[in-house]
């Protein structure tokens, strides 16, 4: 069974809403166990437990929040090199469109790569003009149907990769399920 951890910091509740949606998406893949943890209560054992990790943070001046950075700098510092090879992705909520959420996702991915996580983007579209190539993003609370679907899509794709990488379930590979994909054009 694949294990997915959705680790998040939410200053206003918006990123927490995204975390719930990412978790819903991951749970849609059979044989996937999902846990949500707020960064203030998360421990290294939570990170060890998972096969795949979705990390969410509010956008703070274009990058990840200080609480999320502190978790990796302090809580996970002595665990460097011990979580190599787990699959991971990112999501972020900003104060508005153009508020830096994609850059915040990239800053989260940089942290994850430094710890040895295998990060990915999603080529599928969550709607006519909504993607999550760098992670799922929202301007404030995810209200829009396409933004909500992007969060779920990110979670589903994470659980698919966990199924393939950790459980060897090749039938869950995105290319093995063309009917479930939404590509541009």
Describe the residue ranges of each PLM region:
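N-terminal beta1-alpha1 ligand-phosphate binding loop
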Residues: 2-29
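Short helix-capping segments at alpha-helix termini
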Residues: 25-32, 78-82
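Glycine-rich phosphate/pyrophosphate-binding loop and the adjoining helix
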Residues: 121-185
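Helix-loop-strand module that forms the ligand-binding subsite of alpha/beta enzymes
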Residues: 40-127
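Residue-level preference for long, well-ordered alpha-helices that form the structural scaffold
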Residues: 11, 64, 101, 140-147
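A short beta-strand-loop structural module common to alpha/beta enzyme folds
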Residues: 31-42
């Amino acid at each position: 069974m694949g294990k997915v951890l959705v680790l998040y910091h939410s200053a206003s509740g918006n990123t927490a809403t995204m975390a719930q949606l990412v978790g819903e998406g991951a749970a849609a893949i059979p044989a996937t166990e999902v846990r949500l943890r707020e960064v203030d209560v998360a421990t290294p054992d939570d990170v060890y437990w998972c096969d795949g990790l979705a990390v969410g943070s509010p956008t703070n001046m274009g990058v990840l929040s200080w609480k999320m950075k502190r978790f990796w700098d302090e809580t996970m510092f002595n665990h460097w090199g011990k979580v190599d090879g787990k699959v991971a992705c990112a999501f972020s909520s900003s104060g508005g469109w153009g508020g830096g959420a994609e850059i915040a996702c990239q800053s989260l991915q940089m942290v994850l790569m430094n710890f040895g996580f295998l990060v990915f983007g999603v080529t599928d579209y969550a709607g006519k003009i909504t993607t999550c190539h760098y992670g799922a993003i929202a301007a404030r609370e995810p209200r829009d149907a396409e933004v909500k679907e992007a969060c779920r899509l990110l979670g589903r794709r994470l659980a698919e990769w966990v199924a393939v990488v950790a459980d060897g379930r090749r039938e869950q590979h995105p290319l093995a399920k063309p009917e479930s994909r939404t590509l541009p054009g």
